[in-house]
Amino acid sequence: MLRIPANIRPVGFPSVAETLPKAVERIAQALKPEKIILFGSYAYGNPTPDSDVDLLVVMETNKPRKEHVVDVSLLLYPRLFPVDILVKTPEEIEEALKKRDFFIREIVTKGQVLYERPK
């Protein structure tokens, strides 16, 4: 299910509000992730003209993480705004939360789920 928050507004890159939903849909269709989570300034409602879009893609994979980051990155073209991509498996997320990883915990608790695969 695709959910784009209303607070994504044209700040610095007018195309984010228009382009992000299409990009998330392409990632969801091609890679079948468990979740796509928006985090950082766009998710927290305080983007600046220099802000990038931060995405965490949670998916099962046997490929090296760098390969999946490239796979996701290619699905974002044409890229009209800067994007930072993290790809993690559900197990990596679970392990990070057990270890009290602040960064992952913040993404999971404060981030906005843009897509969640139906169960």
Predicted regions and their residues:
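Short, conserved active-site loops that position catalytic residues or coordinate cofactors/metal ions
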Residues: 51-53
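Conserved H-loop
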Residues: 41
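Catalytic core of pol beta-like nucleotidyltransferases
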Residues: 1-35, 44-49, 60-119
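Short hydrophobic/aromatic beta-strand micro-patches
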Residues: 56-58
